[in-house]
């Protein structure tokens, strides 16, 4: 893997004084490809990676803020599952009542540390905790008016998704909401192929090479497992959500709002 130096720096979109490195994790064509991991190397380039790899990422953040404002209740908890480097929590901190408690959850200690440092640099007075947890095994949701999963559910092993969501909804308050953004697959093979190609074209426009795209696809093959949109709707309804609706779609990316 290529090292990073000052030539790899890009502007800090969070504006919180942390350095953001240019994503070149998969630029080396000779190194062995391992399963994708949210380790220190990924954490160092993550903010650049999501802005270049996720279509309309800033709009996803804006929509999350807009929806959350209608559901977050002062004195209750807001959970960001798979909070990564804390981008979503930083944005919500400026928008929500300070009495809403924030809990960012991730299984990557390196991601959590970056999120913690960014939040400390903000000098917010809000109660905010960054928690290490494995969503496959641990039930951590309690007194939650809002739960956010931005590109997180797709990394939960399929055999664990129902149980994880059951534990999640049990810890949510009535009329609480779950906001999900997911990569999805489709029943129709024609549309599936087309949408995947359109997505890779988007990544090329963001500066990724064919080699980088192919190597990352292979690294994610057994790690990121997307469902069809209908499977996600049925899964959410089956664990007890009374309202489930898709509110965002870009080819093979979907946003879902579910209310208990």
From Swiss-Prot:
Its EC number is 2.1.3.-. Coiled coil: none annotated. It comes from the Bacteria. It catalyses: prephenate + S-adenosyl-L-methionine = carboxy-S-adenosyl-L-methionine + 3-phenylpyruvate + H2O. Signal peptide: none annotated. Keywords: S-adenosyl-L-methionine, Transferase. GO terms for biological process: tRNA wobble uridine modification. GO terms for molecular function: carboxyl- or carbamoyltransferase activity; S-adenosyl-L-methionine binding. InterPro entries: CmoA, Methyltransf_25, SAM-dependent_MTases_sf. S-adenosyl-L-methionine binds at residues 57, 106-107, 134-135, 217. Homodimer. Belongs to the class I-like SAM-binding methyltransferase superfamily. Cx-SAM synthase family. HAMAP family: Cx_SAM_synthase (MF_01589). Catalyzes the conversion of S-adenosyl-L-methionine (SAM) to carboxy-S-adenosyl-L-methionine (Cx-SAM). NCBIfam families: carboxy-S-adenosyl-L-methionine synthase CmoA (TIGR00740). This is Carboxy-S-adenosyl-L-methionine synthase. It comes from Nitrosococcus oceani (strain ATCC 19707 / BCRC 17464 / JCM 30415 / NCIMB 11848 / C-107). The gene is cmoA.
């Amino acid at each position: 893997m290529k090292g990073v130096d000052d030539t790899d720096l890009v502007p800090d979109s969070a504006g919180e004084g942390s350095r953001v490195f240019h994503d070149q994790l998969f630029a080396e064509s000779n190194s062995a490809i391992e399963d994708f991991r949210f380790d220190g190397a990924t954490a160092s380039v993550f903010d650049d990676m999501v802005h270049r790899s996720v279509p309309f990422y800033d709009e996803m953040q804006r929509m999350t803020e807009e929806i959350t404002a209608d559901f977050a209740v002062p004195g209750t908890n807001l959970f960001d599952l798979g909070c990564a480097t804390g981008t979503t929590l930083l944005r919500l901190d400026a928008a929500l009542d300070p009495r809403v408690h924030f809990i960012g959850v991730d299984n990557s200690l390196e991601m959590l540390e970056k999120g913690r440092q960014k939040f400390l640099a903000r000098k917010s007075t809000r109660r905010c905790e960054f928690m290490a947890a494995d969503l496959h095994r641990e039930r951590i949701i309690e007194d939650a008016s809002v739960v956010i999963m931005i590109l997180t559910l797709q990394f939960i092993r399929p055999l664990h998704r129902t149980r994880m969501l059951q534990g999640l909804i049990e810890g949510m308050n009535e009329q609480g909401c779950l906001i999900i953004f997911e990569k999805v697959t489709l029943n129709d093979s024609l549309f599936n192929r087309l949408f995947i190609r359109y997505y890779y074209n988007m990544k090329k426009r963001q500066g990724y090479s064919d080699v980088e795209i192919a190597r990352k696809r292979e690294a994610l093959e057994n790690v990121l497992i997307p469902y069809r949109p209908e499977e996600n709707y049925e899964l959410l309804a089956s664990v007890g959500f009374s309202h489930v609706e898709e509110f965002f779609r870009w080819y093979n990316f979907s946003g879902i709002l579910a209310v208990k």
